[in-house]
């Protein structure tokens, strides 16, 4: 139980995106996906080492080499032609850079689904942060639009027909409220 909790805490404390790379395309890019895979594998190795499952030196070596430069796309693509497995090809290339037998402990006890599900969750989590920032920007624009049009009259609508007059500010205030609810749901 403790080791599962430790693994979860290590993995979900990882940052997937930085201020310099606040871009949805970057979050799902090949290099960033590989870096997240490496971060997860390194976190798993550290958690396992802390519980005595793998040697500490192996976890240190895996963590030290958890950089995307040790998983070049050309080598991964070539390896994938041979093994036809999206994670095995990545791990095989990365293992070649590990020293002192640490490659034996890379991906120890994990499954492809464990790794790629965690990658996806971290990418979605990072994407939500960007989406929330965008919705807050929209909220500020809607607030200005609402204030600027508080006395701008327009025809109300009901079931596709004109209804009693309302203000455009009233109409945009409903968009503002809906946008705020969406922000709260995403948080």
Where are these regions (language model features)?
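Sec-dependent N-terminal signal peptides
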Residues: 4-13
């Amino acid at each position: 139980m403790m080791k599962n909790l430790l693994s979860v805490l290590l993995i979900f404390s990882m940052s997937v995106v930085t201020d310099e790379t606040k871009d949805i395309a970057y979050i799902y890019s090949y290099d960033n996906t590989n870096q997240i895979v490496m971060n997860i594998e390194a976190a798993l190795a550290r958690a396992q080492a802390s519980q005595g499952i793998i040697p500490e030196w192996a976890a240190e070596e895996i963590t030290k080499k958890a950089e995307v430069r040790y998983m070049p796309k050309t080598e991964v693509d070539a390896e994938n032609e041979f093994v036809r497995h999206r994670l095995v090809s990545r791990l095989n290339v990365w293992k070649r850079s590990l020293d002192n037998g640490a490659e034996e402990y890379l991906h120890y006890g994990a499954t492809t689904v464990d790794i790629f599900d965690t990658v996806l969750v971290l990418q979605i989590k990072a994407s939500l942060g960007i989406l929330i920032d965008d919705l807050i920007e929209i909220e500020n624009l809607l607030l200005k639009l609402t204030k600027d049009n508080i006395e701008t009259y327009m025809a109300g609508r009901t079931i596709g027909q004109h209804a009693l007059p309302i203000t455009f500010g009233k109409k945009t205030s409903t968009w503002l409220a809906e946008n705020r609810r969406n922000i709260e749901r995403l948080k």
